[in-house]
């Protein structure tokens, strides 16, 4: 049995997995990618479930991001023991807005500047309510700029079955793994 994204499983879920599948398991994950607000390190409770004879292999080379993004994320998470892949990109921009609508206006501006360069982009929000509000706001603003509807805006929720080109608005938990 292979279990991926171990950081998103709770103690009880691992107990159930062991009970349902009494065999050897390969459990993979990255505690820095948890979907919970607080990081939980499953390695603290896995020995209590599966016994002390656990072989732990730590892979600390990051290949997904540019050095600039990885260093910025590491400052936020406090994780410093990651070997970064030597790939560079633009510096991370941190912007602060008075409200969500001001941030969404900037999203429209940036998207319109770059949309010829990318087939798909995503605006990822924390909650479904925020994502739906953002989608409706963007839809209204984009319709007023382009009444013919050539703006390719999609709202992705739990019921979505298709992934379309353009700008997709969704939540972080639905976007996980789509990168």
Please state what every model-predicted region is.
Residues 4:
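Walker B catalytic carboxylates
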Residues 7-179:
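Conserved helicase motor core of SF1/SF2 NTP-dependent helicases
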